[in-house]
Amino acid sequence: MNQPCNSMEPRVMDDDMLKLAVGDQGPQEEAGQLAKQEGILFKDVLSLQLDFRNILRIDNLWQFENLRKLQLDNNIIEKIEGLENLAHLVWLDLSFNNIETIEGLDTLVNLEDLSLFNNRISKIDSLDALVKLQVLSLGNNRIDNMMNIIYLRRFKCLRTLSLSRNPISEAEDYKMFICAYLPDLMYLDYRRIDDHTKKLAEAKHQYSIDELKHQENLMQAQLEDEQAQREELEKHKTAFVEHLNGSFLFDSMYAEDSEGNNLSYLPGVGELLETYKDKFVIICVNIFEYGLKQQEKRKTELDTFSECVREAIQENQEQGKRKIAKFEEKHLSSLSAIREELELPNIEKMILECSADISELFDALMTLEMQLVEQLEETINMFERNIVDMVGLFIENVQSLMAQCRDLENHHHEKLLEISISTLEKIVEGDLDEDLPNDLRALFVDKDTIVNAVGASHDIHLLKIDNREDELVTRINSWCTRLIDRIHKDEIMRNRKRVKEINQYIDHMQSELDNLECGDILD
């Protein structure tokens, strides 16, 4: 696979090369010369041709953020890289290079046409992100395993495929295998696939295809289930009660509690622990369900607030448009009258009247804006009070429920301590009938040791409960603060933008009036 430009020295993709390429492919007449003088912004370039330049490495393309078509064929590129910012790329030609591995395409989600013809590629992979891929050219490479074809089944839009002059293209079943496993393909190696060939291929590989479809359906169902679980977890996180709809918190209390796990083997502790867990989980589920309900209330409150703000802004804008329309109708009529007037005193008087109308419009628009600012400020303050109260009530009730968890832990601790002391006394007196595991028996050397072990277990459990409560309170308070800050900042930005728009419009009207010089009018 000889490259046509290997006799030249390898070149670097620097700014000079890119500027030259952009200039060469632009208009060559007067418009092109003007564009070269003023400079062409890379971000405005939609197509870039960099073939036959002996490029060794792809680099410095990050500014071409709106590029749609990139031609890099007939170079000596060894690695696909440097394309991360080309998210809008639709067409990419990397044919006639020295590429061995498909990589670096993860951000090209809009790519439809990819050519890797005449490289050194031996495996088809790492194309998962190219969900819109329609045309794939991989001819004249080193692909020798037909299983690579199965990988391409995931590309539902793929209609054209080229794999000629690969080792697999020499296989007797090459065409039939591809037609069977890629039934939506329309062109293979630049030739249209007829319906008869498709039917023969399907019949020949029907059993294997059916088995593969079954496996794909199972995998798809699993992926959908995992996605549903992720979405559900995200919903729970939004409500700040993730992992509280079961025994997760309780289990985490014992996950790092070796003493507690050992003590669970004491006679009578198993039943005690089971009762404790059941009651504890009920409280956690209550927190979880309460959290979801409160999240819905907060969402409703936020949606209502957003709708009120939108309606207020829209109504205010409509009033402003009506005032501007009325002004412009009169203003255009006045300008026409000024141009037709021949007497200078009358012209000056009419210009003063127009200027007064402009000032009156400015006052009216600014008054509308000030009214809107006051209206939105009142709405925002009311929303802030409501959401803060809702968050405060939520925290208060959660803390109350968490206190019940601590009460259960304290009760369990007392019972466990009683059983432990009783067991110690039986061991000392030799009345213990049950055999204890060695790790557990090691705790019963004296009263201090067993009391410390029970106490350490208790401390771990309380810490887990406290940490989960603190995490919930901290996160929802942070959410509330960020939300309110964002709302205030958005309103400030909206107001500044609107005032700027009003001033620009008024300045334009006044400038237009000022340019009506008496000499021009009389002429």
Curated annotation (Swiss-Prot):
Chain's gene name: DRC3
Coiled coil location: 208-242, 366-391
Superkingdom assignment: Eukaryota
GO CC terms in record: axoneme; cilium; cytoplasm; sperm flagellum
Protein name, as recorded: Dynein regulatory complex subunit 3
Annotated function: Component of the nexin-dynein regulatory complex (N-DRC) a key regulator of ciliary/flagellar motility which maintains the alignment and integrity of the distal axoneme and regulates microtubule sliding in motile axonemes.
Biological source species: Homo sapiens
Quaternary structure (record): Component of the nexin-dynein regulatory complex (N-DRC). Interacts with DRC1. Interacts with TCTE1/DRC5. Interacts with DRC7.
PANTHER family xref list: DYNEIN REGULATORY COMPLEX SUBUNIT 3 (PTHR45973:SF12), PROTEIN PHOSPHATASE 1 REGULATORY SUBUNIT SDS22-RELATED (PTHR45973)
Residue ranges of every copy of the LRRCT domain listed in the record: 166-204
Family label: Belongs to the DRC3 family.
Annotated Pfam families: LRR_9 (PF14580)
UniProt cross-references to PROSITE patterns, sorted A to Z: LRR
Keywords for the protein's UniProt record, in alphabetical order: Cell projection, Cilium, Coiled coil, Cytoplasm, Cytoskeleton, Flagellum, Leucine-rich repeat, Repeat
Subcellular location as annotated: Cytoplasm, Cytoskeleton, Cilium axoneme; Cell projection, Cilium; Cytoplasm, Cytoskeleton, Flagellum axoneme; Cell projection, Cilium, Flagellum
UniProt LRR repeat ranges: 44-65, 66-87, 88-109, 110-131, 132-153
